[in-house]
Each structure stands twice: as C-alpha cells, then as structure tokens.
C-alpha cells in the first residue's frame, strides 16, 4: 500500500501555512513546490519564495512525513539538526516545523536546500576511493561532537533517553518479528540478544543511516548530511554507526541486471573495506563490536523485508513505507552475511506467500 499526496494540495496548504506563520500575505511562490527524488520516510519538495524574510531566501526543501511516521519526528529532526549545525557540522538547519494539525495533514519541516549532489552520484572510477575516505572522515567528525547538547535538545523536544539507546533496535526488532509472525528470524534475534557487547563509556552521536544517499557533496567537499531520523539516530557506541553503515553499503538496493551483479558487488565490497579502513585508521574501534552491529542492522533489513511480504500476503495490515531490501538477490546477500558473522541462517517468507 502506498500513499502519495497531491502536489497541488501540498503547495496550497504550505503557502497558507507560511503566510500565517510569517505574518504576511505578501509571501508567494517564486517557484512552486516540485516533488524531487529521495525519501523513504518522507515526501520531499523543492520550492522558493518571493517577498519572504531573508532566512527564507534561496531554494528551500519541504520534508513532509509519511502517515505512519512518529508524529514527533519533525520536532526531533529540528532539534538535532539545529544543534549540529550550531556545532559547525554540515547539517542543514531547520527553519520551520509543522505538526499534523498545521494544515498539511502531516508533520513537516522546511529547511534550506543543500547545494551539491548525492555522494552516490559521484562515486565512479577513482573518485570512489576518495569518497570512501570522505565518508569515513565525515562520520568521524560527527562522532567527535559532544553528545550532551544533543541529548538536552532532544529531551526538550520530548524524546526520552531510552529512545536514543542502541538497544532499541533489538527491542523493536523482536516486537516486529512477533507481530509479523516471522518465526524464521527468531534464532537470529536470539543470537543477537545473547551476544550483546558490554556497554562502552565512549558515547557519541550516531546518525544510524549514514551512507552516500544521505551525504551531499559540492565540488568534492561534503556540503550536507541529511535524514536525521528518530528511527535511527542513537547516542551510544560508535561501532553501532560504523556497523550499520557497513551493512547499508553492502546491501543497499542497486537496480542492475543479473549479469552486472557480480562486478557491482565486488566494487561494493571494496568500497566497504576502504571506508572501514579509513575510519579505523583515524579512530580505532573493536572490530568484533562493528561486526555485531553489522549483523544487527542486517537482521533489521530482513525484518523489514519479511514484514513487507507478510503485508503483501494479507497476513498483517498494509505498510505505508516501501522496503528497500525485499528483492530476492538482496535478501540472499543479507542472509549470507548474517550467517558469516553469527553462524545462524535466518529465513523470511517467500515473496508472494505468507508465513
């Protein structure tokens, strides 16, 4: 099941909201909202205004959250992005926050458009080597930021501390396995529960979804890190962030013919190795902890794919958010990697058939 808002309706309601919030009816569109690529958890529109205050000059982005998104996400994103931007990190500041009752029917944020291109679009040939190092360095810079101002800002935004714990992934995954009847994933979840690493004192800000689709590059330099999701941001072990990134880099969807799958996967493995080496060279971490968190995120992928198949089969209610990990080739790769780390072989329902 998918939900798609009407762009004309979004434009009308957004302008009405902006005029009310900015206190003037003279504000109008220089460029009306246009849907742009990206966003698994939200709908993204680019637009610009005329006769608006200076901070609303230039091209702007509207992120309109999907109906099943945590209603606190807009406030969460505003809090963390503004703190990080204030600390000098390339996170776009949020200019305006809207709740579901503010006219558009769904929570939203407005922020400046980040210049540049997605890092993924620049990763060809020798540039890929440089981008692997750049990705690692940008993540290291994030992990060097004092997490306490972030914790305080998120607490003011209504985000309790347990929501930011890295253990939350395991709790939510176990609950979703039972809700969706994914019995073939129970042994893997049990292994993760039995082999949790001990707590660390080195608490950092973890993006949780740090990969080349969430990093923008302008003239070879990082211009923005986006998509600070309440589902994924954590304050905890830096190995959590590195392991999650390794899993995403290895298994994120790439739509290529079967003939090219082998060479593409080889290139991905090389990129992951370069990224991991660059990170550990400048900020050493326990490799076993990284592998554990890579396995954790890998099982999260399988839970997401399995739940999508159960929903498609009518076993559980429809899911608004599409999965990026549901095709057979991706599932096979994730299962193989999880087995290599844990010795367990998780299983999800076949596509087109419920459990």
What are these regions (language model features)?
Residues 205-207, 212:
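Catalytic-loop of the protein kinase fold
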């Amino acid at each position: 099941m998918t939900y798609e808002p009407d762009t004309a309706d979004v434009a009308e309601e957004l302008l009405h909201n902006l005029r009310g919030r900015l206190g003037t009816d003279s504000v109008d569109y220089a460029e009306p909202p246009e849907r742009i690529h990206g966003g698994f958890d939200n709908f993204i529109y680019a637009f610009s205004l005329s006769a608006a205050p200076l901070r609303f000059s230039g091209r702007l982005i509207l992120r309109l959250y999907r109906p099943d998104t945590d209603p606190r996400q807009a406030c969460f994103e505003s809090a963390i992005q503004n703190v990080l931007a204030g600390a000098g990190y390339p996170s776009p500041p949020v200019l305006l926050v809207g709740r579901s009752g503010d006219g558009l029917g769904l929570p939203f944020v407005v922020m400046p458009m980040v210049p540049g291109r997605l890092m993924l679009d620049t990763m060809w040939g020798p540039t890929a080597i440089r981008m692997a190092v750049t990705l690692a360095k940008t993540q290291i810079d994030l992990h060097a930021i004092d997490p306490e101002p972030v914790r305080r800002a998120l607490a003011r935004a209504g985000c309790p501390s347990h929501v930011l714990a890295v253990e939350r992934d395991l709790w939510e995954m176990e609950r979703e396995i039972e809700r969706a009847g994914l019995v073939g994933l129970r042994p893997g979840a049990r292994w993760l529960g039995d082999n949790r690493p001990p707590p660390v004192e080195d608490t950092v800000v973890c993006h949780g979804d740090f990969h080349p689709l969430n990093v923008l590059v302008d003239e070879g330099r990082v211009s923005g890190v986006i998509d600070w999701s309440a589902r994924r941001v954590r304050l905890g072990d830096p190995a959590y962030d590195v392991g999650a990134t390794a899993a995403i880099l290895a298994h994120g969807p790439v739509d290529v013919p079967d003939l090219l799958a082998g060479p593409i996967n080889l290139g991905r493995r090389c990129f992951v190795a370069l990224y991991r080496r660059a990170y550990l060279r400048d900020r050493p971490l326990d490799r076993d902890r990284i592998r554990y968190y890579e396995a954790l995120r890998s099982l999260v992928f399988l839970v997401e794919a399995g739940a999508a198949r159960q929903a498609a089969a009518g076993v559980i209610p429809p899911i608004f958010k599409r999965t990026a990990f549901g095709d057979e080739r991706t599932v096979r790769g994730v299962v193989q990697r999880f087995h290599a780390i844990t010795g367990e072989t998780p299983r999800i329902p076949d596509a087109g058939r419920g459990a």
